[in-house]
């Protein structure tokens, strides 16, 4: 049979094909008939109609003509609904524009692009109520008071009121919420900062005889000390530390970089680069030398990694990091870097030993430690690099271990010894806030946070604040405090996880915190050398995040920068004044053929090491330093915060206290033991011929001065005025003996070859070598401002009432009468 001749059968289905038909059919199967289905459906519709009628009838009654209140309420509701839902399109457009400008800010490569996008976003964003975030009325009243005082024109009133009431956080104007998402500082705060800066410049630039230079400088020092300092803190984070480059670069470009910079781990690398370079060198480094930041070496094969871990206990070899740091910082010490740039560098390290506390290395606590050694120790994270020994410069400039080696087991008597080693400071003190507060009077911190275990938590905290409001932000802060509290409890109880608890028990944030928005790709390469593209990406992230904080930084640091500018200008004027006085004195002495009137400016405290290292000078050091300061100030903007260059070379360059001669040490002991009566100090007249002791005055010399006077009394009559000189030389082996005369003190320099020989008299008068005895004050930092003010007071008394006499020189010695009004024990 042929298959093609078979009849085709169409497909068929049982039951209705539509959904409604199937539903009815299904319902009929469970009902007795269609009439029963219609009755059930009618009852269901009637039930819901009655319920709807009972619900709607009260609202319908409002439309009755005899119920005007109901009609008014209904019209109000309808108007509100129309207003609410007719603006949906407009609000959607505004949200789209805000999103667009935010994306522009996230991808901006220059500050101009970012500022334009931020300005447009600020227009699209509803304005906040600023009076809820700070005391606007207090700032306005203070601004009016300052303007009224300036219009009166009394500089002393301005100085008096500003010295009494000048604080950083006036009316909570440093509130971080106030500056969040803002391009500019709020108007009233900006006007207040500008007014204070204007009045500070008025005091600084005043030429009236009402205020002396010393008085203005003292006022600026005291006000700055009371106002406080700002420090920049850079956290750890391995290769994520390239984020700090963008932060520092932005602060440098806007001239907001603080003078105090501290960090740990990779943050210490960026701090070392910044603290060892001038402004032009910093800008050149950011533009051309980013590729030199190679933190890690090549891991190599599996066997080399296993061998390194078994022998050194570390994954990477630290020699690559040491070579990079040597190229970046040379062999500079903390003191030399401070003398060269004026910036204070702080690096934190901690010890593997259980009972040794962490340290913050700086030019005060460890002046001669080599910077590259401190940075490598601060980067030695356990398992990544082995712990390192600190290196320092000795008296001859050689690189030696900072700590002497000690016996590992003295009870057994073994001869093996090892030096003290240090490791990553972020393990215990990632942000050394407490140390900087104690040493440098810091009360405001700018923190760049890139730690992989902290940055995500801070980003989450910002998201909670942005989407949850203030109450949610307070809850997030409460959770943070609870975590830190539990970690501190773990540390107190001494549980085995104490090392992990230390990471979370530290301070994470500062007054202004810049948090890195790291991606998963960046976290995956955290212990690898970043490529040039990755470095640029991280640096751009740092720049954009810092641009968002510029408003807060300008508001918090504006007055501080104005104080720094004024102090820098006044210090420059004082250096010029002293140079002119020395030049005029030298010219007058050479013209009249008389000995110069050299002064020794002794204060009521022992001078610091940086000031007293002068005995081996040839007399031209002051002039060289003054010329260098003039050239340096002419080549850069005086408005930066680090123009306070020192007046003397550091002790590491001129020999320092470790290279003092025996005679210089004797002279220092003599200055410390002087005990001059206050009547004698005030009794000196301005004329060189006036008597040393006023009528009715008393003088009580110290036992050391009495002994010195009795020793040299036989030789004092043979000393006469010698040839014209401006200074004397004290060399190794010479003896410096004091003597009180009728018009001051005589300092007899007895030559080494004449010790033990009788006085010959005035046979061969030689011309002594030229060296200056006056010691210009090295500009003090904020930790010694009060002592510096005492020096300034002594200088003023010296100018007003001291008597200056001439210098004489002979074979047996040379006399230097010194004003008694400036030597006070």
From Swiss-Prot:
Per the record, pH dependence is:
Broad optimum pH around 8.0.
Q: Name one GO biological process term.
A: triglyceride catabolic process
Q: Where is this motif: GXSXG?
A: 263-267
Q: Which residues are glycosylated?
A: 129, 327, 331, 601, 616, 637, 800
Result of mutating residue 241 to D? In sdp1-3; loss of activity
Query: Its membrane topology, per UniProt?
Result: Peripheral membrane protein
Enzyme Commission number(s): 3.1.1.3
Q: Which residues form a coiled coil?
A: none
Tissue specificity: Expressed in roots, leaves and stems.
Looking at the record, the residues that make up the PNPLA domain are 232-437
Residues the record marks as active site: 265, 424
Biased segments, Polar residues type: 632-653, 801-812
Primary site of residence: other
Record's miscellaneous remark: Transcript levels do not correlate positively with enzyme activity, suggesting a post-transcriptional regulation.
What the protein does comes down to: Involved in the release of fatty acids from the oil body in germinating seedlings. Can hydrolyze triacylglycerols and diacylglycerols but not monoacylglycerols, phospholipids, galactolipids or cholesterol esters. SDP1 lipase activity is required to limit triacylglycerol accumulation in roots, leaves and stems, which are vegetative tissues. Functions synergistically with PDAT1 in regulating fatty acid flow from membrane lipid synthesis toward peroxisomal beta-oxidation through a transient triacylglycerol pool.
- Which named protein is this? Triacylglycerol lipase SDP1
Q: Whose protein is this, by species?
A: Arabidopsis thaliana
